[in-house]
A protein has these predicted regions:
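A charged, aromatic-enriched C-terminal amphipathic alpha-helix characteristic of glycosyltransferases
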Residues: 300-335
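Short, conserved structural micro-motifs that define repeat-unit consensus positions
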Residues: 81-84, 95-102
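Active-site donor-binding loop signature of nucleotide-sugar glycosyltransferases
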Residues: 34, 107, 156, 286-287
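Conserved acidic donor-binding segment of nucleotide-sugar-dependent glycosyltransferases
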Residues: 282-288, 297-303
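A short, histidine- and acid-enriched strand-loop-helix "catalytic/donor-clamping" loop
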Residues: 103-117
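Nucleotide-sugar donor-binding catalytic core of glycosyltransferases
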Residues: 1-52, 58-66, 73-74, 82-89, ...
Length: 340
């Protein structure tokens, strides 16, 4: 099987995991970095930003020309687009006329745009062109089915080396609250409210200093790579907060925290209750007041009990296949259904 994946090749891109594990499974993959091409142009200088915003830039035309040329050369069995903000519907229609099945995976939502990078008209206008829509979000799956688009659930996952996990296990625990992520309006408001209720919290991310100023909030730069996993494991309480497009589901942190054996405090969504056992593998909250109570409860756990919860959620992650290698195996089954 030959799969053409269009998306990003930046270090944080989820498509990297599928490229890695599809190749491991024997699939020939071409990774076309459409989003990277756009951002490399847009972020190069102020001039490029002005030209793009004025509508005079040819960057998207160039990307779509390259998209078609690479497809012609690679001759894939399937085209898998991640999100698709840079790909014109006309380019997808061109591929469809060549009888190449089209698959989409959107790590945000094609229906709810919560920021500049979460969607655009290319995403909206391409929905009906896809033969298969993979999503982590059950509400999006339902909406796709009303539009007569075949849709399947493909949750987020984690990708953590065994040697790094073993190292993380040895890290001395800090009995404090941590939040890993960049600020948005809802996150800032919630964390400010926690601070007002005398909850001390360490936040890691970009630009937090612009939005919060409290003696109860300590701000650190974002962490990546191996350091990300070390920080995720290190704290007694890892707070997870949802965004407007995933308020009822789960996010990437849901399974990353589980995979490293972190003690996660997350909103009581349907997904979190489906994938984890409350009070045994995760702690859930419904509002600010219950979050504060849960924080106190978790911080007061005996170390032996805390370690038991860490062991439970790590074990659940392994037993139920929450890692990206298993997610890729599931995705591959769907891809095979398209061409057989």
């Amino acid at each position: 099987m030959r799969v053409f994946i269009a998306g990003s090749d930046k270090v944080y891109a989820i498509e990297n995991f599928y490229v890695k594990y599809l190749r491991k499974a024997g699939v020939e993959v071409y990774h076309f970095p459409a989003q990277t091409m756009f951002y490399d142009y847009y972020q190069k200088n102020v001039y490029n930003k002005i030209v793009y915003k004025s509508g005079l830039s040819s960057v998207l035309n160039d990307i779509n020309r390259a998209f078609r040329n690479k497809i012609e050369a690679f001759r894939p069995d399937i085209i898998w687009v991640f999100k698709g903000m840079e790909i014109f519907p006309e380019s997808l229609q061109w591929a469809k006329l060549k009888s190449i099945p089209l698959v989409n995976y959107n790590g945000d939502s094609p229906f709810v745009f919560s920021g500049k990078g979460s969607g655009n008209e290319n995403v909206t206008n391409s929905i009906g062109l896809y033969d298969l829509f993979l999503t982590y979000n059950r509400e999006d799956k339902k909406q796709m089915e009303t539009k007569k688009v075949w849709s399947e659930i493909l949750p987020f996952g984690y990708d953590l080396r065994d040697d790094l996990f073993n190292e993380c296990q040895q890290i001395e625990e800090m009995n404090q609250v941590c939040f890993l992520g960049n600020p948005d309006e809802e996150r800032v408001s919630f964390i400010k409210d926690l601070a007002k209720m005398n909850v001390k919290i360490d936040v890691y991310g970009n630009n937090w200093k612009r939005y919060v100023n409290s003696s109860n909030i300590s701000i650190y730069q974002p962490v990546y790579g191996d350091d990300f996993w070390r920080i995720l494991r290190k704290y007694r309480v890892q707070l997870n907060l949802m965004r407007p497009h995933n308020l009822t589901t789960h996010n990437m942190r849901s399974f990353e925290a589980a995979g490293v054996g972190a003690i996660q405090l997350a909103p009581a969504t349907e997904d979190h209750q489906l994938y984890f056992k409350d009070n045994e593998e995760i702690f859930l909250f419904k509002d600010l007041q219950s979050c504060v109570k849960q924080i106190a409860k978790i911080k007061n756990l005996p170390l032996e009990k805390a370690n038991c919860i860490r062991k439970n959620v790590r074990g659940r992650s392994l037993a139920d296949g929450y890692n990206y290698e298993k997610r890729s195996e599931k995705a591959l089954l769907f891809l095979k259904m398209l061409i057989h």
